[in-house]
Each structure stands twice: as structure tokens, then as C-alpha cells.
Amino acid sequence: MQFQQLTYFVAVAEARHFTRAAEEVHVSQPSLSQQIRALENELGAELFSRARGNITLTDAGEALLPLARRILADADTARHEVQELAQLRRGRVRLGATPSVCTGLLPEVLRAFHDLHPGIQLLLEEGGSHDLVRELARGALDLALVVLPLPAASPALTTVELLQEDLVVVSSAQRPRPGRGGRVRIADLEGEPLVMFRHGYDLRELTVAACRAEGFEPSFTVEGGEMDAVLGFVRAGLGIAVVPHMVAARSGADLRATPLARPGLRRTIALAHRSDVAPPRAARELQRVVLGPV
């Protein structure tokens, strides 16, 4: 049974005339009759009574007509839905990003994407790179903005480096600036009260590793927060924190950012997706927008 045969059948049923039905569907009358006969043979029943030139539906034809209309309507709906997705008028993208990227980079990128494709729904998951890599691996995300290098046990992922960002030390504007000469050495953090991110957070691991490389264990006054919480605790004067420059630049006048002395700390942000699964069309378009300036 073919969609074309059902289309011809519905046309004849509505016109009650083979020639007029053939004109309606833009096919020759013999071809239409041949397809109707093939459909009847496949179903094992006559669909039309052709007595004395009058075309009427048989019981089998009456039973098939509403089903055929529904099948054709569903096919048309499916065709429209697929075309909408293919032309990026509808769809969704599941994007993961670290909190600092959500704060610093994504607002402008997502605004640009939304302006281009307002019908595409953006589902954002915020988390550390370890969590995002795990979500990519199980198919819960289409794309993720992660920090390189990836965890050693990461599944096969394709990554494209997006940017490198410097880390800075943020402190309350009400307390003395840390360090000397307008810059902070990692060694200057020894004994300083640090507001620290939760375990599994890339910035925590990077900061702790840098302190240990200088021969000391960092001292935490508060630990376990996400980006917004950490900045809030710093504003309240509970300590200082090491954060990306793009976050500090947007944190307001009540926070003061001090650069780290050379060589400083930097991290690389990359856009990742699974290597074994091609991202959906909408995700590929977001990928193009994200990587546009690269």
C-alpha cells in the first residue's frame, strides 16, 4: 500500500468520477485506474462499485476512506514537521556549560542564536566539566562548553578550542587589595581566607593544584558553593576567590579584580560533542554560532 494509491483512492471517493479525480491529482485516467486496481488487489476487496457508470463506494471502500484520510493527514503533518526542523524553524538544543561560561560568554552567544532562530528551544544545563562530560557520554546533552584537558576517563569526544581565559583574584571592594604592586602571586594566597568552589569544580582543582605547586595548602573560610554563591560570599567580606576574568568583569563595583602575577593561571574553554553521534541540525547551527569568532 502506497501513499500515492491512497491519494488516488480518496480523490475518486470524493469526486465519484475517475476522470475528474485524475484531473484533480494531475495524472492520466488510465494510470489512476491502474493504481486503484493494484490497491484493490493488495487489499483483496473491491473499493468501488462501477455499475452503469455510477461510481459508489463498496463497504470495503467506506471502511477504508476515513482511515486513508487519516493516514494522508498524518503523512502531511510528518512532512511539515520534518521540514520545520530541517529549516530550523523548530527544534531544541541541549547545551551544557560551566557556571563561569554561563555568566561570561553565553548571554551574547545565545542572544545571537535566538535572533537567528527564535523557534529553536535552548535547554541549558549548568555544571562542572566532569559532570558535563558524563552527561554528553550518556546522550543527555548535544553540546557542552568544557574546560580542557578533559578528565582522563572521558569517552570519545570531539573538542574544538574556543578561547583561553586568564584567572584573577576577586575581593570585596571594602577590604584591602591582596598582593603587592597591583598583582597577586600564587604564594601570596598562603594564609589568605579563600572562598572555594565545591569538589569537582574545575576552578577548585586548578587553584588547589597551583597552591600545592608553591608548597602550601590553601585555607578555606567557606567552601562548596557555585559561582554565584562564591561571589556573594566574597562581596560579604568572607574571603577572596580565584575566578575567570570574564566573570570578574561582570561582577559589579562591589568586587575588585586583581590580576595574578606571571605566569599566572589560565584555562582553555572548548566546545565538545560525542565523536560517535552527529549532533542534530539545530545543535550544529548553534555550534557554528559559538565558533564563529574562533
PLM features: what roles do these ranges have?
Residues 128-141, 147, 198-258:
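Hydrophobic hinge/microswitch elements
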Residues 105, 256-294:
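A late-sequence structural motif
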Residues 147, 177-185, 193-214, 279-287, ...:
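Secondary-structure junction motif
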Residues 40-57, 62:
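A short LG(V/I)-centered, amphipathic sequence patch enriched
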